[in-house]
Amino acid sequence: PAMIFPEVLQKAQAELTNWLGQGVSVMEVSHRGKYFMELIAQAEKDLREVYHIPDNYRVLFLQGGARGQFAALPMNLIGEKGKALYLNSGHWSATAAKEARNFAEIDEITIVENGDHTRITNLDFSDIAEQYDYVHYCPNETISGVEIFDVPNVGNAVLVADMSSNVLSREIDISKFGVIYAGAQKNLGPAGITLVIIRDDLIGHARQATPSIWNYATQRDADSMINTPPTFAWYLCSLVFKHIQAIGGLKEIAKRNAVKAQTLYDYIDSSKLYRNV
């Protein structure tokens, strides 16, 4: 988990026991009631504007965290080719590949080289990517401290990204991805809700045995509410989206992140105890 904007927490605090003048908390209202349905519609609208999400992509607010998506992806995306390619840049991409192997044939390529300095070895897979139903990578490995700023070249293949720790950290071209997924607890809000942004044509191909809660088509048709959602987490995410809009969008967020990163690395570089690898 990471820091939530103080302004968001203050607004949530002010509304905690009396949301929209109803005399009750957002945690207590019906998730299918008029006010909460309006909230989730506005939250999606705000996220689409902030992240420049094209019209041919669906936005799902699910549960189960990124680990749930490790299983959902192969159940929904493995098709005629029968296999997927996972780019291993560290712990989380390796963990995703391990889970996916329970459901499909998975090939794995290591794309980091560890020496005096960790570096990315290759991001051009256009010559082999179309042999696979999708190519998966994690652009920010929090455990090993590796962030990949360039988008892998996979030709016309489907690119899937686990952006749990760098979603909404800067502007990106959504159209380069087939699926983006992220646990909320780093940049979106509190733990308990999971964002999935998926291109329309990738929905509706789940294997027959896919549980309904992991079936993207079922969740799309149910407005991400096949079961009772984490209403408070969804509400806080909606406040985060509003706040990002108010402070200038992702360009401003990227500037702030650059300052924070530089401050940290300057300290590490000047320290006699720590070293930057």
Region spans (language model):
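Active-site C-terminal subdomain of aminotransferase-like
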Residues: 5, 184-265
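Conserved PLP-anchoring active-site segment centered on the Schiff-base-forming lysine
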Residues: 78-94
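Conserved active-site segment immediately N-terminal to the catalytic lysine
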Residues: 160, 174-185
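Conserved small-domain helix->loop->beta segment predominantly found in fold-type I
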Residues: 253, 265-277
